[in-house]
């Protein structure tokens, strides 16, 4: 895990690195943020039928959070995510959605 200069993390943040998490300079997080490059299973319907505690730990890559990113309260950043510099998410994302891109678009509903 690499954390840049002048980062501020809110209360009760949870960071876990199985492979790699890179956080740039000047990153700000709210409270209760989770940043984890691993999960209990893949994002497929088959794996979702298995209770999370019984799934094998899975990681498909790293997390990169570039400079000057603001992550609000209760956000969850998972494996394979890259957040470009100076980014802030300002719109709702529907439940059970996988989103990508800038602007964000839904690529999968699970």
What are these regions, as identified by a protein language model?
Residues 1-79, 110:
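Flexible, glycine/small-residue-enriched loop-and-beta-strand segment within the central core
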Residues 76-109:
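C-terminal/domain-terminus segments
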């Amino acid at each position: 895990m690499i954390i840049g200069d002048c980062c501020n993390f809110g209360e009760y943040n949870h960071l876990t690195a199985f492979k790699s998490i890179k956080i740039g300079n000047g990153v700000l997080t709210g409270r209760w943020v989770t940043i984890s490059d691993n999960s209990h299973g893949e994002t497929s319907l088959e794996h979702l039928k298995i209770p999370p505690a019984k799934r094998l730990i899975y990681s498909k890559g790293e997390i990169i959070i570039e400079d000057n990113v603001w992550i609000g309260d209760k956000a969850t950043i998972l494996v394979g995510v890259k957040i470009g510099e100076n980014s802030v998410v300002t719109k709702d994302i529907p439940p059970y959605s996988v989103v990508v891109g800038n602007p964000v678009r839904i690529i999968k509903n699970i």
